[in-house]
Amino acid sequence: MTKHQFKLSDPRLLSRIGYQFKQPELLQLALTHRSVSHKYNYERLEFLGDSLLGMIIANYLYHAYPHENEGRLTRMRATLVRQEALGKIATDLQLSRCLILSTGELKSGGHHRESILADTVEAIIGAIYLDSSDLNLLKDIVLKWYTPYLDHIEPTDQLKDPKSRLQEYLQARKKPLPVYEVVDIQGDAPHQHFKVECLVDGLSKIHGEGASRRFAEQAAAAEILKLLEQ
């Protein structure tokens, strides 16, 4: 079994995505960067996924904000589909450790590059659609990925990451700020995997994992927000 096959069959990856592929080769293609192959890579899937994502988010905003004008809806959509937002989705899905990159791209830190992570999210969207041929299913999956962000976006807001939102949540309630601590690092650079512990007053310690300390902290903050906002 190759390293890439292991990743594709990893139930944790499929669980995070929220979809079981009938054609796993589509997921492999969605994770394959152009540096590996000029012909067999995610770029065509990214093209498809970009259009599908724009439609899904536009449809959501149209129905969720019936009184907003076209200009504000356009700005909200742009906020939700821009590279930074997709990078956050990729962090939540822990895609950085699953990317299929050339040795050179990997050594240069490509698995942390926001543009590559964002492209991969769009490619996975395209792959799910081709595998399922079910637009409603795809919509449900994508909106589930976006739940932490859709619950907070307003027509005049910019998308905020989980750490920023958690800090604002606690400050608004005059509570101590969260404390983050790295409790485990596995592997050697650039293949390290971090586990971070986050402590918030009144809650049990919550852990987050990721391919960098920043990603792990964001994952932990996202989990705490889910508990606080229940």
Curated annotation (Swiss-Prot):
PROSITE patterns: DS_RBD (PS50137), RNASE_3_1 (PS00517), RNASE_3_2 (PS50142). One of its GO terms (biological process) is tRNA processing. Its cofactor is Mg(2+). Keywords: Cytoplasm, Endonuclease, Hydrolase, Magnesium, Metal-binding, mRNA processing, Nuclease, RNA-binding, rRNA processing, rRNA-binding, tRNA processing. It catalyses: Endonucleolytic cleavage to 5'-phosphomonoester. It comes from the Bacteria. The active site is at D50, E122. Its EC number is 3.1.26.3. Mg(2+) binds at E46, D119, E122. GO terms for cellular component: cytoplasm. Residues 161-230 form the DRBM domain. It is found in: Cytoplasm. Residues 10-133 form the RNase III domain. One of its GO terms (molecular function) is rRNA binding. Belongs to the ribonuclease III family. Homodimer. NCBIfam families: RNaseIII. Digests double-stranded RNA. Involved in the processing of primary rRNA transcript to yield the immediate precursors to the large and small rRNAs (23S and 16S). Processes some mRNAs, and tRNAs when they are encoded in the rRNA operon. Processes pre-crRNA and tracrRNA of type II CRISPR loci if present in the organism. This is Ribonuclease 3. It comes from Acinetobacter baumannii (strain SDF). The gene is rnc.
